[in-house]
């Protein structure tokens, strides 16, 4: 029997399953990746500092050479940090951070350097967090933060241990701005007090916080756009912060005067230098070439008139332009205001120190220029319908900055590489000649050191430090008459400074002129009675003068009280026996 075939039914096929896509990164995850990339990029450029030495330009005075800091965290050290005006600044938090380094890392200069790098990376992350919260734009904020982290003009603030105050202050600066954005979103007493606390902590790291209340007003204009809505309240609420800022400025000025850092530069020269420096900082932001640790003032404070007028006109044109465009592009007014205002304390109208300008002064102010650049470039690319160029242009800018910074960081390896570079890219640099000479002298390379000290004296014959260094080098080379002549000039130029008197006393003692040597040590002792070395040398000089042995013993015993020394105790015992 033939089987009847079953009727065929159409097979139902399942619809094709679309390929599974990996879930997109959430906003928070993407932000974390950006922050991680910022930290990694920063350490990629700066990790080399882990093998660097302290440089002989304030590093040792701020760390292992400072008796209050080198002991780490102690009750006496904390009291000193809160009251000290050393280095011409009131910066207790910065001192405490150096104490922590000495507590955990001792004299290992590499770890002191890496602490700076960590704080710089943290500041870049805080900048990114603040800008994204304030503007609502992730990638523009991230690019500003990357350029901040990688820009060569910031190398001085990071690779120089003594500039710990820059990177520490920046962390509190950006934290305070983020806290202020939160306060502006939902005002309240608690949030306002958080802003005030951040401000105070930043001021305890570096006095640059003095301009922050004015920057908050700029943020009210853009990007927060709340200045018109809140009216006078936006101004009144800044007054307590302005009061704190004025108090901080007064403390900083008095500290600088106490440290004799406020120099008498003619006002017309200061005004000319301020105009030139504003223009130069803009140029160095976009073309960071020939950077140095120290830039001297022009000889006799002479500025060329026509270039100076051109720079003044340029600044006036930019200022006018950002005001005219304030409604169409409000970020320009905010960025320019940020740049101009935050530079005011260090632009040189009140001259502090010998420098004409400094890379480190752009650490915070550069953010204003970067905001103008990034937001402006983004708008231009949108109008040109060329947004696809944004990523390659941003990558090129970051890569170029990273490469240039890597090279610039290398100059900070030690004092010799740092100051040889400064001499290569500047003229008439007394500081670079003195510091390079000092490094060579301390390394036992006296014949190499001498020409640098002689050059420093030629640049500024009225510099007590240059005369003192030259005299010390000549003395170590056995040229005592020449050494004494230079040190006598140093004493005349700086009669209230301890070291010239002490060095002259040492040279006179080696020359056998003990009464004159004792007189110089006595002058040094009057300046600082608690200097053990001066007391020791005064005692030794007096011990060689007939009839003055009791005085000699008194000073040697005082030296031993200040700094106990077994060898000195043997000398004291010998002199006591001789006295009997």
Feature-to-residue mapping (PLM):
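Polytopic membrane enzymes that build or remodel cell-surface glycoconjugates and lipids
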Residues: 2-478, 492, 499, 503
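Terminal, low-structured helical/coil segments at or just beyond the last alpha-helical repeat
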Residues: 544, 550-580
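Boundary/linker segments of alpha-helical solenoid repeat arrays
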Residues: 431, 464-465, 498-499, 532-533, ...
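Register position in tetratricopeptide repeats
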Residues: 442-443, 476, 510-511, 544-545, ...
């Amino acid at each position: 029997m033939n089987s009847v075939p079953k009727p065929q039914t159409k097979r139902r096929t399942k619809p094709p399953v679309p390929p599974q896509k990996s879930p997109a990164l959430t906003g928070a995850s993407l932000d974390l990746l950006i922050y991680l990339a910022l930290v990694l990029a920063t350490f990629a450029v700066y990790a080399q500092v882990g093998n660097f030495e302290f440089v002989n330009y304030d590093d040792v005075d701020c760390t292992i050479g400072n008796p209050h800091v080198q002991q780490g965290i102690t009750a006496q050290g904390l009291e000193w940090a809160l009251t000290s005006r050393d280095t011409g600044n009131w910066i207790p938090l910065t001192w405490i951070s150096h104490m922590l380094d000495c507590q955990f890392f001792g004299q290992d200069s590499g770890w002191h350097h890496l602490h700076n790098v960590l704080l710089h990376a943290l500041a870049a992350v805080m900048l990114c967090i603040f800008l994204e919260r304030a503007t609502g734009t992730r990638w523009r904020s991230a690019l500003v933060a990357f350029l901040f982290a990688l820009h060569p003009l910031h190398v001085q603030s990071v690779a120089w241990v003594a500039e710990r105050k820059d990177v520490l202050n920046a962390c509190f600066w950006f934290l305070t701005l983020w806290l202020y954005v939160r306060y502006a979103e939902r005002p309240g007493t608690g949030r306002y007090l958080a802003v005030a606390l951040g401000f105070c902590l930043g001021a305890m790291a570096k006095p640059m916080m003095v301009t922050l209340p004015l920057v908050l007003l700029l943020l009210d204009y853009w990007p927060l756009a709340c200045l018109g809505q809140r009216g006078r309240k936006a101004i009144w609420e800044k007054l307590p912060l302005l009061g704190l800022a004025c108090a901080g400025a007064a403390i900083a000025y008095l500290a600088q005067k106490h440290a004799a850092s406020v120099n008498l530069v003619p006002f017309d020269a200061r005004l000319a230098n301020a105009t030139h420096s504003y223009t130069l900082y803009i140029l160095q932001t976009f073309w960071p070439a020939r950077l140095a640790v120290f830039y001297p003032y022009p000889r006799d404070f002479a500025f060329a008139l026509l270039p100076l007028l051109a720079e003044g006109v340029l600044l006036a044109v930019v200022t006018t332009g950002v005001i005219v465009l304030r409604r169409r592009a409000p970020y320009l007014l905010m960025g320019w205001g940020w740049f101009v205002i935050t530079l005011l304390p260090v632009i040189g109208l009140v001259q502090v120190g010998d420098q004409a300008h400094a890379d480190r002064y752009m650490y915070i102010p550069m953010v204003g220029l970067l905001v103008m650049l990034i937001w402006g470039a983004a708008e231009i690319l949108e109008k040109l319908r060329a947004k696809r160029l944004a990523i390659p242009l941003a990558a090129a800018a970051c890569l170029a900055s990273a490469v240039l910074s890597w090279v610039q960081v290398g100059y900070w390896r030690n004092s010799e590489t740092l100051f040889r570079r400064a001499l290569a890219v500047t003229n008439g640099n007394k500081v670079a000649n003195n510091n390079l000479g000092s490094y060579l002298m301390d390394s036992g390379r006296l014949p190499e050191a001498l020409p640098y000290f002689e050059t420093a004296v030629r640049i500024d014959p009225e510099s007590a430090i240059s005369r003192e260094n030259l005299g010390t080098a000549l003395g170590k080379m056995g040229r005592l008459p020449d050494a004494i002549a230079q040190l006598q000039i140093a004493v005349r130029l700086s009669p209230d400074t301890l070291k010239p008197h002490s060095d002259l006393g040492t040279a006179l003692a080696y020359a056998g002129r003990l009464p004159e040597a004792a007189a110089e040590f006595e002058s040094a002792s009057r300046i600082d009675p608690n200097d053990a070395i001066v007391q020791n040398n005064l005692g030794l000089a007096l011990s060689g003068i007939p009839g003055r042995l009791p005085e000699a013993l008194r000073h040697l015993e005082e030296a031993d009280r200040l700094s106990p020394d077994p060898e000195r105790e043997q000398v004291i015992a010998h002199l006591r026996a001789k006295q009997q």
